[in-house]
Swiss-Prot record:
The keyword Lipid metabolism applies. GO terms for molecular function: ATP binding; tetraacyldisaccharide 4'-kinase activity. Coiled coil: none annotated. This is Tetraacyldisaccharide 4'-kinase. It comes from the Bacteria. SUPFAM superfamilies: P-loop containing nucleoside triphosphate hydrolases. One of its GO terms (cellular component) is plasma membrane. Belongs to the LpxK family. It comes from Bdellovibrio bacteriovorus (strain ATCC 15356 / DSM 50701 / NCIMB 9529 / HD100). It is an enzyme of class 2 (transferase). Pathway: Glycolipid biosynthesis; lipid IV(A) biosynthesis; lipid IV(A) from (3R)-3-hydroxytetradecanoyl-[acyl-carrier-protein] and UDP-N-acetyl-alpha-D-glucosamine: step 6/6.
Length: 339
């Protein structure tokens, strides 16, 4: 099947290549913000673990006393103009987007802005307030906005064949685009088979600094009551999973390290907007599975919280990332653009 898609991938790659070439030659205009801009992005269409890395960076910058704003796109959301995310909005996830709301909830000292165009949203943010730094969420391909640092995340669990250009693979542009990156991050390294990790490393440009991050679920929190269960308390328990993320297989793999995952678990398409009917189907499937716990991701919890408002059966995972090797190196790299 993939071979039949190759001609379409070739055409797509040519179009993207022309666009990038025009940006490289300065034909297209670029907005340069009055403060440093750091992009955290990827080559593929999603599921690299970008949001946890962004959250990791925000927490380290806030701890260092920096005033930071996040620039994101209102993907599959209702916001039609640049605006500041309001976590108290009655339908926050639907209006602003699940990932922006998740980042805003986890980092109350950070301003998170969304809009249909990242460069316009960045302009809106710096016109409203003074910041030390802008973090552009998923900004690698958005070249209309100048950035001072390009961080690209590569999923260590991703098959190398998926780095073929869309629609044959999952890449938004060819592997050659990685040369625009200043720093590469290999995510989920602890979840990747050693041979696959080595194959990915062998393909990386030799002139790029590479950082390694591991991902682990340490606990679950009840969405309604706030009760926390450590991973050790879930050992031997049957877990029914529900998610709408790009890589549900990775979510399942992490949960299998904790408990027994039900084979009746439900996974929707990435960024799916849940409905009341979805919740009824989830509840019915959960009951039929006879699982002990109904577990979802943090990103999904921001959308499901209100829909499960009358019951305390839903639990949200807490994903932690750990920097391997030289601790604090990513923070050091980012703060260098402030000097």
């Amino acid at each position: 099947m993939r071979a039949y898609l190759r001609p379409l991938s070739f055409l797509y790659d040519q179009v993207v290549g022309v666009k990038n070439n025009l940006y490289d030659r300065g034909v297209f205009g670029v907005f340069k913000a009055p403060v440093p801009v750091v992009s955290i992005g990827n080559l593929t269409v999603g599921g690299t673990g970008k949001t946890p890395i962004t959250d990791f960076c925000l927490k380290s910058l806030v701890a260092d006393g920096k005033k930071v704003a996040v620039i994101s796109r209102s993907y599959r959301a209702d916001a039609s103009a640049p605006c500041l995310v309001d976590v108290d909005h009655p339908f926050a996830a639907r209006y602003f987007g699940d990932e922006p709301v998740l980042l805003a909830q986890a980092n109350p000292q950070v301003s998170v802005y969304v809009g249909p165009s990242k460069w316009r949203t960045a302009r809106y943010a710096v016109e409203k307030h003074k910041y030390d730094l802008l973090i552009v969420d998923d900004g690698f391909q958005h070249r209309r906005l100048h950035r001072d640092l390009n961080i690209v995340i590569l999923d260590a669990t991703e098959s190398l064949s998926n780095y073929e250009v869309l629609p044959e693979g999952r890449a938004r542009e060819s592997w050659a685009g990685i040369e625009r990156a200043d720093v590469l991050i290999l995510s989920k390294c602890n979840l990747a088979p050693e041979d696959e990790l080595k194959a990915l490393e062998a393909r990386l440009p030799k002139n790029k600094e590479v950082l390694y991050f591991g991902y682990e679920i340490q606990q679950c929190q009840n969405v309604k009551t706030g009760q926390v269960l450590h991973r050790d308390e879930l050992k031997g328990k049957k877990l029914f999973l529900v998610s709408a993320i790009a890589r549900p297989d990775v979510f399942e793999k992490m949960m299998r390290e904790i408990g027994e995952v039900s084979n009746q678990s439900l996974h929707f398409r990435d960024h799916h907007q849940y409905t009341a009917d979805d919740v009824k189907n989830i509840e019915n499937a959960f009951k039929k599975s006879q699982a002990d716990y109904l577990v979802t991701t943090g990103k999904d919890a921001v959308k499901l919280r209100q829909l499960f408002n009358d019951t305390a059966i839903l639990w949200s995972t807490s994903l932690e990332v750990a920097e391997s090797g030289r601790k604090g190196r990513l923070h050091e790299i980012i703060t260098q653009v402030l000097r």
